């Protein structure tokens, strides 16, 4: 299973996270987010992540210039579009930066199937998150049954995922490729090493130091 930990803000948290056999680590560049990091900060933090782990910048309705800066000034190699971006934005990014992984986050609402079809040619991976006017970050789960209709594209489940919720999700036998976790590896708004370790050991089936 693909495991992405997201919303990192400190060097110590990153140094611990990259030891946990995760597949991707996310940095949020969105001023309205409590986990927002500037491009200068992302430049420093992303350089702490080894090449074996995707370095993901999470953006919401970015300008072309923001994308250009993130991909020229930092060690980012994946862009997660988490807003209302159109296909043209994703296509532009994919064409200009063919080696960059394109991720599209979508809300788990009644438009989900339609929007997956809309973006599937441009997106390498989808993230399905709890609907919110603030574009995610709620820490709340959604009705996972809506995922039954997703059959032909890879997607990660987001929305307050913890070890216990992952176990509940697994019982449904859906086709998720993995999980995108931010609040589920935090305690009182800060990254919790024990939660990171617990989830990665459960998902990857390996004991980490």
From Swiss-Prot:
Belongs to the TrpF family. Its EC number is 5.3.1.24. It catalyses: N-(5-phospho-beta-D-ribosyl)anthranilate = 1-(2-carboxyphenylamino)-1-deoxy-D-ribulose 5-phosphate. Keywords: Amino-acid biosynthesis, Aromatic amino acid biosynthesis, Isomerase, Tryptophan biosynthesis. NCBIfam families: PRK13958.1. It comes from the Bacteria. The keyword Isomerase applies. InterPro entries: Aldolase_TIM, PRAI_dom, RibuloseP-bd_barrel, TrpF_fam. The gene is trpF. GO terms for molecular function: phosphoribosylanthranilate isomerase activity. Pfam families: PRAI. One of its GO terms (biological process) is L-tryptophan biosynthetic process. This is N-(5'-phosphoribosyl)anthranilate isomerase. Transmembrane segments: none annotated. Pathway: Amino-acid biosynthesis; L-tryptophan biosynthesis; L-tryptophan from chorismate: step 3/5.
């Amino acid at each position: 299973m693909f495991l992405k930990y997201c919303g990192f803000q400190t060097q110590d948290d990153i140094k611990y996270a990259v030891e946990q056999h995760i597949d991707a680590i996310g940095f949020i560049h969105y001023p309205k987010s409590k986990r927002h990091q500037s491009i200068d900060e992302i430049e420093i933090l992303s350089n702490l992540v080894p090449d074996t782990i995707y370095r993901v910048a999470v953006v919401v309705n970015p300008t072309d210039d923001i994308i250009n800066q993130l991909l020229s000034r930092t060690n980012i190699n994946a862009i997660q579009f988490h807003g209302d971006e159109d296909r043209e934005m994703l296509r532009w990014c994919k064409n200009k930066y063919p080696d960059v992984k394109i991720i599209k986050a979508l809300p788990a609402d009644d438009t989900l199937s339609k929007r997956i079809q809309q973006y599937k040619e441009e997106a390498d991976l989808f993230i399905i998150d709890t609907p919110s006017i603030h574009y995610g970050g709620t820490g709340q789960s959604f009705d996972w049954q809506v995922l039954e209709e997703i059959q032909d594209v890879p997607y990660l489940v987001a929305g307050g995922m913890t070890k216990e919720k992952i176990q509940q999700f697994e019982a449904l036998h859906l086709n998720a490729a993995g999980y995108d976790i931010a609040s589920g590896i935090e305690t009182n708004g800060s990254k919790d090493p024990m939660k990171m370790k617990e989830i990665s050991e459960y998902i990857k089936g390996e004991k980490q130091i």
